[in-house]
Amino acid sequence: MSSTERLQRYLTDERGGCGDEEVAQRLDELEELDAAAGGPALEADVGVLSALANETRYKIIRILHIAGEELCVCEFSPLLDVSDSAISHSLSQLTEAGLVTRRKDGKWRKYQTTMRGDALLVALNGSRR
């Protein structure tokens, strides 16, 4: 059974009858939804969510958010049970996703959350029951 036939069956059940014109109209509406949900915003959002989909990266951004100030990369080592290389790699991924900023201060690199990173954490914190 094609997806169009299935849609027609659904519309018939829901509306008590459905012709080809109603199916075509509904397909147009669904295509508009698909166009609005896709595109560059979808790719960017998936990139951000991918950056958060790792325990080390998520813990780093939570630490930065709670700290409310810049932290040096060396300050994460005592808090995380991963290598310094893994911490640096995680911070780079969070920076590329636009969730943290990096600033060089002499020989040290300091990181802090961006407004977007903070907003995502506030939203996640607010969604817990």
Curated annotation (Swiss-Prot):
By its UniProt entry, which InterPro entries does this protein fall under?
A: ArsR-like_HTH, HTH_ArsR_DNA-bd_dom, Metal_resp_trans_reg, WH-like_DNA-bd_sf, WH_DNA-bd_sf
Which residues, as ranges, make up the DNA-binding region of this protein? 73-96
| Source species, domain of life | Archaea
Q: Which keywords does this chain's UniProt record carry?
A: Arsenical resistance, DNA-binding, Plasmid, Repressor, Transcription, Transcription regulation
Which biological process annotations from GO are given for this protein?
response to arsenic-containing substance
Q: Which SUPFAM superfamilies match?
A: Winged helix' DNA-binding domain (SSF46785)
Q: Single GO molecular-function term? A: DNA-binding transcription factor activity
Domain HTH arsR-type, chain residue ranges per copy: 37-129
Q: What happens when the gene is disrupted?
A: Deletion of the arsADRC operon results in increased sensitivity to arsenite and antimonite but not arsenate.
Q: Which PANTHER family match?
A: ARSENICAL RESISTANCE OPERON REPRESSOR ARSR-RELATED
Name recorded for this polypeptide: Putative arsenical resistance operon repressor ArsR
The record lists the organism as Halobacterium salinarum (strain ATCC 700922 / JCM 11081 / NRC-1)
Which gene carries the instructions for this protein? Answer: arsR
